[in-house]
Amino acid sequence: LAVALPAALAVFSPAAFAADVVVVTDSRHPFKTMGGERLIELDEPHRIEAELSAELPNDPEQATAIVKRRLSSGGTDLQRRLASAYQGVTDAWSLGITSLPAVVVDQRYVVYGEPDVARAVARIEQHRRPQP
């Protein structure tokens, strides 16, 4: 019974139903995670670009040199952050997201406006269950 109980409980948890959970939001729409979901913040590219362009001089040549230094000193971590941020924006667009926050399950079901990811997933799972 002790071994069967955790497995039985897992069957009823929202995470057990959802194979792929994506949260699409921005810094103005906080949310409560359930763990394991992918996060796409649509304003992340802008925040990274703001870091790169912070306190640049008015001289275009100096500004260009500083940005190049910042890009090279950021190394692969910065490249990974930029690529991931822009890939997230592309993925949200391809999923057809129209409002924030959005919780997407299995690239098919979407709940808009629910900041609690577990609650959004539970709503989707309730909808997916066979109706009597």
Q: What do the PLM-derived regions correspond to, one by one?
A:
Residues 5-6, 16:
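Cleavable N-terminal signal peptides
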Residues 11-13:
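N-terminal signal peptide c-region/cleavage motif recognized by signal peptidases
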Residues 28-30, 109-111, 117:
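Solvent-exposed loop/turn segments at secondary-structure junctions
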Residues 52-53, 57-80:
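Conserved segment of the thioredoxin-like fold in thiol-based oxidoreductases
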Residues 74-97:
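Thioredoxin-like thiol-disulfide oxidoreductase module
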Residues 113-132:
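C-terminal partner/receptor-binding element of secreted or periplasmic proteins
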